[in-house]
């Protein structure tokens, strides 16, 4: 070790010889160039003397210049290439800032409410004192020592603004994002932006239960394959900026003293203020879905950040915001059957039938209800696209946790690039919604990336079971399968982390994972995966019989249908189902006869059972135990 360090220091401090100085031409090379030049001159002069060539056509001066300046040109050329590359990279980078906040109401009473808040210079000046105090609180040192890592509600209520931006105001922050120099490819529905088109398609797909044979008869019109801008998933700063937008969606906005007037907000939905019912005008922001819209300087690219599960809000006063609705939608999207984990659980829908049996039709209808988050996120996108036309604007979607799953569902519906952070598995919800997909689309054209880490139990799909933290908090997070690409940081192997709910926080993802690694995680396709494999999903209003019941070892096997066996003359038995019953005399057949009849091999009842109830011996009523 010391010898190597010594050699390094000696090499560093030794003088540079004259032959190593850049641009110097030592005598050996000068002599070599002189000899070559002399031979070339004599040869060309001889050829010109005999009239074979014309020296003027060769440009001898340029040849000499190239020979003498070869070393000097090579180095500046490489630098020029690097400069050209850097200029190309800089052109791919744009700066984004918050322009709008959309709030869409949910629930039976507020689902028609939809409002927009524009972040203008006048709005920032109006609430300057609030933002000054807000920035000071964000700059304070984070103290998570008293947090119970086994309490999901405590973790959701932690301040989750990343340390890398702790001195910046979330409402005025500017974030650099690079687009990939390689375009993404996509195939989209031609009429996806026509009013009512997607709603009618999803409703019809629900009626036919997503049967591809029936849906293919509709002959949906798909656009030709086109190239679109996608985020650079290999750029660390881009990932940090997108994750920060996801974190920004948790920020609580300033509230006026006279909350009823809401002079800063603009109604963009069907809801109209009801002066007689004050409850609809007060506290409306506590129920619903929120999206923060960041726009590039040239207004050509828009990034929508979908808010995740509350409790992870930043300081700013107010209530727990959308916690109640978030929990209901979590349990609807990511559970096998309405969060029916045990008999003491209160389900979020009435689709449960019996043990490990659920009504599939009921589940699909619940997901498409107008007062649920999927319809809300579709309406939110429609209002964003009304301001920024999709024909001239690139729209990307991002989100954390529940927001990431909703972003994935929205992106798959409209063909938008999506980057989701620590989202629970949304493949099950995608199948239940019967989202439209172009036939034969390859994985690389989905443009959906899920960023996660192996120490997050929610992303990995292991936060379930009777003793899990999610279960104790009332969250049925039973899905593990994602769509699109998975970009997973293996912090358990690389950093020795343990699985903990604190690793689900967006602050941890930004400060301790993305920025801690030298390179971004490799994105791979989702391996074959299936959620809720032990559940039986039924449908009672179709002509196709339901799936057969799962075998029950505690129940005697049914009596088989009688069958007769005949010989084909080659000692091969041929069985055929008979419609008549077998007579008792058929058991005693003539030994000389080629037709042989035997009782069915399947027993009729259980003769012996083990101590835990498994049948160990089957037989008929009149059979006697051989051991007796």
Curated annotation (Swiss-Prot):
Alphabetized UniProt keyword annotations: Autophagy, Endosome, Glycoprotein, Hydrolase, Lipid degradation, Lipid metabolism, Membrane, Signal-anchor, Transmembrane, Transmembrane helix
Transmembrane feature ranges: 33-53
Region (Disordered): 540-605
Chief place of localization: membrane
Protein name listed in UniProt: Putative lipase ATG15
Membrane topology listed for this record: Single-pass type II membrane protein
Coiled-coil spans in chain: none
Assembly behavior: Binds to both phosphatidylinositol (PI) and phosphatidylinositol 3,5-bisphosphate (PIP2).
Function field: Lipase which is essential for lysis of subvacuolar cytoplasm to vacuole targeted bodies and intravacuolar autophagic bodies. Involved in the lysis of intravacuolar multivesicular body (MVB) vesicles. The intravacuolar membrane disintegration by ATG15 is critical to life span extension.
Transmembrane helix is among the record's keywords: yes
Family, per entry: Belongs to the AB hydrolase superfamily. Lipase family.
Composition-biased stretches (Polar residues): 591-600
Annotated CDD domains: Lipase_3
Cellular location(s): Endosome, Multivesicular body membrane; Prevacuolar compartment membrane
EC number: 3.1.1.3
Disulfide bonds: none
Catalytic residue positions: 401 (charge relay system)
Originating species: Scheffersomyces stipitis (strain ATCC 58785 / CBS 6054 / NBRC 10063 / NRRL Y-11545) (Yeast)
Superkingdom in the source lineage: Eukaryota
Class of this enzyme: hydrolase
């Amino acid at each position: 070790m010391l010898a190597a360090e010594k050699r390094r220091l000696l090499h560093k401090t030794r003088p540079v010889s004259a032959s190593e100085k850049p641009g110097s031409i030592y005598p050996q090379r000068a002599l070599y160039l002189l000899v070559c030049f002399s031979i070339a001159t004599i040869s060309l002069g001889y050829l010109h003397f005999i009239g074979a060539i014309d020296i003027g056509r060769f440009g001898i001066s340029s040849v000499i210049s190239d020979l003498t300046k070869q070393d000097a040109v090579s180095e500046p050329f490489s630098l020029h290439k690097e400069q050209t590359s850097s200029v190309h990279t800089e052109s791919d980078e744009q700066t984004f800032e918050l322009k709008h906040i959309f709030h869409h109401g949910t629930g039976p009473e507020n689902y028609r409410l939809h409002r927009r808040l524009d972040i203008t210079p006048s709005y920032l000046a109006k609430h300057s004192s609030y933002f000054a105090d807000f920035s000071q609180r964000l700059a304070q040192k984070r103290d998570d020592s008293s947090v119970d890592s086994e309490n999901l509600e405590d973790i959701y209520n932690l301040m989750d603004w990343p340390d890398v931006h702790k001195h910046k105001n979330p409402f005025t922050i500017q974030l650099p994002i690079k687009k990939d120099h390689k375009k993404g490819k996509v195939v989209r529905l031609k009429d996806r932006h026509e009013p009512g088109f997607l709603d009618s398609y999803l409703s019809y797909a629900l009626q036919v239960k997503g049967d591809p044979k029936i849906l293919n008869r509709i002959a949906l019109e798909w656009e030709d394959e086109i190239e679109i801008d996608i985020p650079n998933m290999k750029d660390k700063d881009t990932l940090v900026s997108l994750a920060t937008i996801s974190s920004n969606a948790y920020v609580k906005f300033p509230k006026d003293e006279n909350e009823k007037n809401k002079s800063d907000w603009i109604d963009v939905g069907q809801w109209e203020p009801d002066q007689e019912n004050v409850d609809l005008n007060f506290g409306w922001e506590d129920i619903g879905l929120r999206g923060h819209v960041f726009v590039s300087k040239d207004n050509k690219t828009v990034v929508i950040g979908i808010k995740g599960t509350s409790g992870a809000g930043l300081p700013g006063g107010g209530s727990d915001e959308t916690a109640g609705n978030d929990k209901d939608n979590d349990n609807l999207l990511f559970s096998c059957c309405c969060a029916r984990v045990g008999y003491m659980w209160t389900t979020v829908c009435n689709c449960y039938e019996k043990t490990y049996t659920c009504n599939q039709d009921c589940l699909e209808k619940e997901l498409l209800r107008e007062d649920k988050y999927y319809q809300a996120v579709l309406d939110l996108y429609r209002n964003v696209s009304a301001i920024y036309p999709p024909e001239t604007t690139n729209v990307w979607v991002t989100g954390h946790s529940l927001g990431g799953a909703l972003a994935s569902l929205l992106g798959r519906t409209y063909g938008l690039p999506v980057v989701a952070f620590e989202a629970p598995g949304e493949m099950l919800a995608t199948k239940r919604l019967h989202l439209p997909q172009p036939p034969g689309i390859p994985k690389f054209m989905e443009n959906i990336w899920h960023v996660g880490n192996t120490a997050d139990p929610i992303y990995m799909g292991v936060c379930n079971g009777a003793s899990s933290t999610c279960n104790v908090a009332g969250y049925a997070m039973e899905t593990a399968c994602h769509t699109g690409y998975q970009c997973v940081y293996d912090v358990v192997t690389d950093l020795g982390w343990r699985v903990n709910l604190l690793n689900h926080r967006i602050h941890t993802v930004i400060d301790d994972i993305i920025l801690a690694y030298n390179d971004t995680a490799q994105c791979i396709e989702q391996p074959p995966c299936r959620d809720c494999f032990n559940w039986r999903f039924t449908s009672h209003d179709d002509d196709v019989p339901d799936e057969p019941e799962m075998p029950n070892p505690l129940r005697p096997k049914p009596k088989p249908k009688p069958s007769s066996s005949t010989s084909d003359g080659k000692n091969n038995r041929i069985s055929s189902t008979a419609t008549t019953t077998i007579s008792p005399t058929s058991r005693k057949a003539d030994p000389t006869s080629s037709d042989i009849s035997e009782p069915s091999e399947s027993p009729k009842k259980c003769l012996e059972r083990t101590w835990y109830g498994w049948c160990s011996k089957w037989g008929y009523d009149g059979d006697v135990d051989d051991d007796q």
